[in-house]
Amino acid sequence: MSIMKKPDLSDPKLRAKLAQNMGHNYYGEPAWPNDILFTFPICIAGTIGLITGLAILDPAMIGEPGNPFATPLEILPEWYLYPVFQILRVLPNKLLGIACQGAIPLGLMMVPFIESVNKFQNPFRRPVAMAVFLFGTAVTLWLGAGACFPIDESLTLGLF
């Protein structure tokens, strides 16, 4: 018994659908059991084998090895905390820095209420939400890049 389902080309309904470029789902190789039982496990095993082989043959170091007896000149957090670190570093009062970080989620929660008149889902037709998103992205990138510079050059990114 063949797994392939042969189309009946003498059927007028099928001929009409084929004339309209339809009917490709009526014949061909089925996904079950051919793809799911044979092709997918081979792809998954190959991917796992490739990643494991690369990890064993060429172990890449993540940064330089740590030395517990030497303190670095400047301690930086992980890259995703650079903007928060920069806010705390630049603002003179630490309470003001914490208040600014608390104001960010509060401001984001206010955006739907500010733009509640606009019923469009398309982001290009929602100017307030798009402006808040673009401004927040630009400020986050600016703060993140500034965290890598010394404190006196961090706000200007060393350009001025």
Swiss-Prot record:
GO cellular component, one term: plasma membrane-derived thylakoid membrane
GO molecular function, one term: electron transporter, transferring electrons within cytochrome b6/f complex of photosystem II activity
Topology class, membrane: Multi-pass membrane protein
UniProt entry keywords in alphabetical sequence: Electron transport, Membrane, Photosynthesis, Thylakoid, Transmembrane, Transmembrane helix, Transport
Transmembrane feature ranges: 36-56, 95-115, 131-151
Entry-linked InterPro entries: Cyt_b/b6_C (IPR005798), Cyt_b/b6_C_sf (IPR036150), Cyt_b6/f_cplx_suIV (IPR005870), Cytochrome_b_C_euk/bac (IPR048260)
A single BP term in Gene Ontology: photosynthetic electron transport chain
Subcellular compartments: Cellular thylakoid membrane
KW NADP (keyword) present: no
Pfam families: Cytochrom_B_C (PF00032)
Family statement drawn from the similarity comment of this UniProt entry: Belongs to the cytochrome b family. PetD subfamily.
Subunit composition and interactions: The 4 large subunits of the cytochrome b6-f complex are cytochrome b6, subunit IV (17 kDa polypeptide, PetD), cytochrome f and the Rieske protein, while the 4 small subunits are PetG, PetL, PetM and PetN. The complex functions as a dimer.
Summary of the function given for this chain in its UniProt record: Component of the cytochrome b6-f complex, which mediates electron transfer between photosystem II (PSII) and photosystem I (PSI), cyclic electron flow around PSI, and state transitions.
Name listed for the protein in its UniProt record: Cytochrome b6-f complex subunit 4
The species this protein was found in: Picosynechococcus sp. (strain ATCC 27264 / PCC 7002 / PR-6)
Taxonomic classification: Bacteria, Bacillati, Cyanobacteriota, Cyanophyceae, Oscillatoriophycideae
Name of encoding gene: petD
